[in-house]
From Swiss-Prot:
Belongs to the calycin superfamily. Lipocalin family. It is found in: Secreted. It comes from the Eukaryota. Glycans are attached at residue 154. Disulfide bonds join 52-173, 137-161. This is Japanin-like-RA1. Residues 1-24 form the signal peptide. It comes from Rhipicephalus appendiculatus. The keyword Nuclease does not apply.
Amino acid sequence: MQLPLSHLLACYILASSIPSWTTSTPIMPAINKETLYLVGHSRSLKLTNVACVISTYRGQKDGWVERNMNYAFSVGKPWRGQSSTIHVQWRPYAALMNARTSDIVRHDLQTKPQYVVRNYDDNSLVLSDVKDESSPCSLWVTRKYLDNIPETTNRTFYHQCPEPIYTTIDEKCFENK
């Protein structure tokens, strides 16, 4: 049995349009040039008096992405700012992301050498400790999503992270950067 030429043409048009229906692979925001803002974390991280945690891209070196980690201590006036270089490394589709930070950042922000990538898209990222399934998390977004966290990312943060707390990035953060 032969298909009429019009059916073959219709099948070809349908099949050739399928790639445009799918979305492309998201770009991991921790290794691209976007500025990232910490907008949530697990209560157990106890980031006492730390505000405005912002990570900016600096470049790449020896397979690692260099980023500035800027944050402020919200005690007293004016806020006391802190800045340090961190290094992150992530292999495409890997479940783990490596991080190298200074002792000061490790103390102030309780950073770890490795994180589980729970969820990411082009503009948001949920990281957690490597310990176990219900380990402390952090939620990062680009400026575009400061007021509107993507639904899948938000759901991941809320359901997979113990005692999630949302933080705010207000205008003081940009004044004290």
